[in-house]
Amino acid sequence: MQSIGSIMNVGMNAIFSRILMSNAGIATFGVYFKVQSIVFMPLFGVTNASMSIFAYNYGARNRLRFKKAWKMTLCVTAIIMSIGTLLFQLFPQQIVSLFDSEGKITAEGIAAFRIISLHFPIAAASITISVTFQAIGHGIKSMFMSILRQLGVLLPAALVLALVFKSVESVWWCFVIAEFSAVTFGIISLTKIWKHEIEPMPDGAAV
């Protein structure tokens, strides 16, 4: 998965440098890539911890506890990412200024952070679904979701947006498009799996 992130970095920088000829775009993307880890770190902490709970209850065939853990995880991750979105929407200038004391990319950074952060709540659902796939033995679907959201849809969308609109600001929408594509695939796939694998499980002991 780390290699996917590396390829995404190379691809995005190539779009900014070779197609849009924008050093500000490259710098802004670099700042975002550093800051986003602060938002996503607690999300990954919650989902990684939840994955073992999902796997245990799936293996124990305890439907009620599985569903309870899943709903709680989704709620917590949604809250975390909603807070992240609010911070990026309300304080983008302050965040960017931490990395741009001279104000060279402040305007670009404000626009970028406000657009990109729109995908944070969607990412909460995407990543929760992705770890669910891992927990119940559908790792290929989890990997496919990661590829969709970080590479397969994101880079082509960024390229098309850059070529069509010829602006750095338009490219940031690729994050929203990619996340929406990934969560759509995830919801459709998980709905089928839930019907055939989760719902038939016995109730178990309610906790």
Q: Predicted regions span which residues?
A:
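Alpha-helical transmembrane segments of multipass membrane proteins
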Residues: 1, 5, 9, 36, ...
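Structural signal for membrane-spanning alpha-helices in multi-pass inner-membrane proteins
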Residues: 2, 13-16, 44, 88, ...
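Hydrophobic alpha-helical transmembrane segments
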Residues: 4, 39-43, 111-124
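Helix-terminus/linker motif at the lipid-water interface of multi-pass membrane proteins
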Residues: 7-32, 38, 56, 94-103, ...
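Small-residue-rich hydrophobic transmembrane alpha-helices
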Residues: 10-13, 28-86, 90, 123-145
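Short alpha-helical transmembrane segments in multi-pass integral membrane proteins
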Residues: 54-119, 161-207
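C-terminal structured "cap/appendage" subdomains that terminate the fold
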Residues: 125, 129-155, 159-166, 171
